[in-house]
Amino acid sequence: KLKMLKNFLYNKKAPNISLGGSFILTDQNGKIFDSSKVNLKKLIYFGYTYCPDVCPFDLLKISKIFENNPNLKKEIKPIFITVDPERDTIKKLKIFMENFDQSFIALTGTSEDIKKVLKKFKIYVKINKSNPIDKDYLIDHSSLIFLLDKNDSYIKFFRPNELKRNIALN
């Protein structure tokens, strides 16, 4: 355990952590996206388009990093995965992503597809509906950003406020 902690603290790949992996979802243009076919590292953020504050703010921070460091786009693919496939349709994602760097890809899928990906990353999600047919609701979810290697293996996670200083180190 001490070795694992030291590896994490010194920004090395932590051994024996089962997070991440390949996934297939649908992008904001309606095309199938297979993460295993992307020969870049992946920076993954989970959120939803109806989020009133945190998600758009975090995505804007990620977007600015890529806008200000164009060479990162040759190494890392920024990815937004919805935790709200019921409301985050392909059309909604396409409009939403117009606010961010063009290198970003937004992904959705069926509820089952999204649940599988959430499980791979151990993402906590709680939908706060006042009744089952409520369409205006908030979602509590993990707010972490994951970095995967070219083979979709976990490298590290960041909290949004740690991203800028750590992204260059990986």
Model-predicted regions and their roles:
Residues F33-I62, I79:
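Short active-site neighborhood of thiol/selenol oxidoreductases, capturing the structured segment around
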Residues I24-L25, L147:
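Hydrophobic beta-strand positions
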Residues K61-L72:
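Short hydrophobic signal-anchor/transmembrane segments that target glycosyltransferases
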Residues K94-S142:
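Short, internal strand/loop/helix patches
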Residues G20-G21, K41-K42, S142-L144:
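Short loop/turn microsegments at loop-to-beta-strand junctions
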Residues K1-I24:
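N-terminal targeting signals for export/organelle localization
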Residues K74-D88, S103-E112:
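Thiol-based oxidoreductase modules, predominantly thioredoxin-like and allied folds used
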Residues S130-N170:
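Thiol-/selenol-based redox modules, centered on thioredoxin-like
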